[in-house]
Amino acid sequence: MIDSIKRMTDEISGILDGKLCGIWLFGSVVFDDFKLGWSDIDFIALSDVQITEGQAEELLMLRQRLSENEPTNPYYRLFEGIIANKSEYLQNSYSKLVYWGTSGQRITNSLAIDVFSRFELSKYGVPVCGAKDCSIFEEPCRDDILSAVWSHYETIRKYAKQTDPTLYSCGWLLDIARCIYTLRYNDVIAKTQAGVWALENHIFQDEAPLMRALEIRRAPSEIPSEFKSREDIKRWLTELGP
């Protein structure tokens, strides 16, 4: 994975003609909680100059191009984040940025970076290219954090009513644990660590589902694919909803 991060940062810098303020990582990679099959490689890249239309078009499908060139590499497709101009990021007003997400990618002039990402960047962001200073990432205020937790809670209530046989279904349990930790301590931690904390502090009334979710998440990287194909696991996942 480290080699893939280096290759990706080099490619982004090259497309931007080296006019890169910096690239920062956050999320599971920074928390040493990256789990293949569960996790993304979250990043933000900020340029020193305006991104041209040609550069944006070249950056748009960079993940796919690198994946096609190295079909056995599972990491390039997992990069998620934005590539934008630093000044525009600070003003929260964009003329053009490139967004890579789970469901696709796009060139846009409008994007709201979620509170949890901003929180992680401000406190735990790791520079991997260019500027070493994370002070440009402002820590969200308590009201913003409370609002984000409430919004995420509503999302869970909406989409976890009917779970499916994917591992993401039990991932909701870890999200809940993480949100409760954030409310209590005004901080962010890794999903696995949040699950362990919730068990140790008996946060959940019924701890059995969380224990099983942690068992799956903590399995070696080659094991999740086995869990995905097991009928008992798939049945359990689909029955997790209320």
What are these regions (language model features)?
Residues 1-24, 54-57, 242:
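Helical scaffold of the NTase/Pol beta-like nucleotidyltransferase catalytic core
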Residues 9, 117, 195:
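Generic structural marker for isolated residues within well-ordered, non-membrane alpha-helices
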Residues 17-19, 37, 72-77:
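Short helix-terminating capping/connector loops at secondary-structure junctions
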Residues 25-65, 78-81:
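Catalytic metal-binding acidic patch
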Residues 28, 83-88, 215-218:
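Residues that form or immediately flank small-molecule/cofactor binding pockets and catalytic motifs
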Residues 56, 61-166, 179:
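Conserved NTP/Mg2+-binding pocket subregion across the NTase superfamily
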Residues 120-242:
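Conserved nucleotidyltransferase catalytic core and NTase-mimicking acidic/glycine-rich helix/loop elements
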